[in-house]
Design a protein with these regions (language model features):
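Alpha-helical transmembrane segments of multi-pass membrane transporters/permeases
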Residues: 103, 158-184, 195, 199-202
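Helix-terminus/linker motif at the lipid-water interface of multi-pass membrane proteins
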Residues: 30, 34-53, 122-129, 185-192, ...
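Residue-level signature of the transmembrane alpha-helical core
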Residues: 26, 30, 64, 68, ...
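Small-residue-rich hydrophobic transmembrane alpha-helices
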Residues: 52-112, 149-168, 258, 262-266
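Short alpha-helical transmembrane segments in multi-pass integral membrane proteins
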Residues: 1-22, 80-145, 189-245
């Protein structure tokens, strides 16, 4: 029996499968929080207050990008789950490839913008000049790995759309612990400071993305699209944006509020 068939939620009773599907989602959100928490705790303890301020002031900016990606991936997963339930595998493959191509393009553009504009953005929210060099270094490194953040969210939401919410959680937990050990190694042992903390986060996210990709290739033949990975469907992209924009903006508005408050406090 294939992995997909084992997680088919269109058959049988719904309550227990629904609870079993939901719990890993909740746990995954909790472990997602450990990334920035680990960075803040370890940097604050072993580097100093200014380094902690650099991480703290960068967090809302980083979260805006992550939440935009997460929201759009959620929109895509709604469509993918509907297509999978209807056994419309041709549309499903086009949905997957379209989301992947659009998300990678968005991630690259967003990363390049932040590499160029990190300092002006930090000044716009009135981050103290003394904290800008470290905050800008942290942001640039984090955004260089934004494509890994997208790919994990994309692959994880694709597996969830097909009924498997446990496997993405296992990879996320592994990545979260590796991030903690990476922080300790790069910050405490190598003494790379804020940059080391960002490198640890990017490396752990890259590994999480790699593990998802390997698992999908071995266990979920339906998602091994081959040349179909390069199919781009504008109409499906429009539907994805329509479904995902509400969720993305709802979450981003909270971070924008934090940025406004932060800029007022920094005045």
């Amino acid at each position: 029996m294939s992995t997909i068939e084992k997680h088919d939620m269109t058959q049988g009773k719904i309550l227990l499968p629904l609870v079993s599907f939901t719990i890993p989602l909740v746990l995954g959100n909790l472990f997602q929080l450990t990334y920035n928490a680990a960075d803040s705790v370890i940097v604050g303890k072993y580097v100093g207050e200014q380094a902690l301020a650099a991480v703290g002031t960068s967090t809302p900016i980083m979260n805006i990008a992550i939440l935009l990606i997460s929201g759009m991936c959620m929109g895509a997963s709604v469509l993918m789950s509907s297509q999978y339930g209807a056994k419309d595998y041709d549309t499903l493959s086009r949905q997957i490839s379209t989301t992947m191509l659009a998300g990678c393009g968005f991630s690259v553009v967003f990363s390049l913008l932040m590499l160029l504009l990190a300092n002006p953005v930090l000044r716009l929210i009135r981050v103290p000049e003394t904290a800008i060099p470290e905050a800008a270094a942290y942001l640039r490194i984090i955004f260089m790995g934004l494509i890994f953040t997208f790919m994990y969210n994309f692959l994880a939401n694709t597996m969830r759309a097909l009924g498997d919410s446990k496997t993405p959680l296992y990879f996320l937990v592994t990545s979260a612990f590796l991030n903690i050990f990476g922080d300790l190694f790069f910050v405490v042992v190598l003494r790379w400071g804020v940059a080391g903390s960002a490198i640890a986060t990017v490396c752990s996210e890259g590994l999480c993305c790699l593990l998802c990709g390997i698992y999908i290739k071995k266990k979920i033949p339906l998602l091994c699209l081959g040349k179909k990975w390069w199919v781009f469907d504008k109409s499906l992209l429009g539907k994805t944006v329509s479904y995902g924009s509400t969720s993305a903006m709802q979450q981003v508005c909270l971070q924008l509020g934090k940025l406004i408050i932060q800029s007022v406090v920094n005045t």
